[in-house]
Amino acid sequence: MKKVIFLVMIAAIGFNMTASAQKAINSVHFYDVKNTDMEKTYIASLKEINTIMAEMGFPKNYYSYFKLAASDTTKTYRNCTIGHWTSEQDYKTIHDHPKFKAWANKNKDINAVFVAGQMYRKMYAAD
């Protein structure tokens, strides 16, 4: 499990090549999705907020969704969402924006299932 978490976090940092390494950050959320219907709803929610962030003027900031292979026997934290942020300031501006807050409020019942039991980390470039 530790290897999986480490590899996903390294991959998250590697995926964010849209900003300088000194400024870019990633938010990493590990959680469990209980069924495929919930997964589909959650993915649709992420697509919606990615579109909203682009409309707000932040097209290089977005969420990606990952899951372990079906053959992986890990019992917990089988799913992961990675937020890709060009800077700490952009992260704050986006999360404070009325459109982001409206999306979060609209989806709070859907996303609360994942947030309640998640392991969350905000990762910064090491160099």
List the predicted regions and their residue ranges.
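Positively charged n-region of N-terminal signal peptides that target proteins for export
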Residues: 1-4
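Short S/T/G/P-rich N-terminal loop/turn motif that feeds into the first structured element of a domain
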Residues: 6, 15-101, 114-127
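Repetitive helical segments and hydrophobic/amphipathic motifs
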Residues: 11-12
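Short, exposed beta-strand-loop hairpins at the edges of beta-sheets
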Residues: 106-115
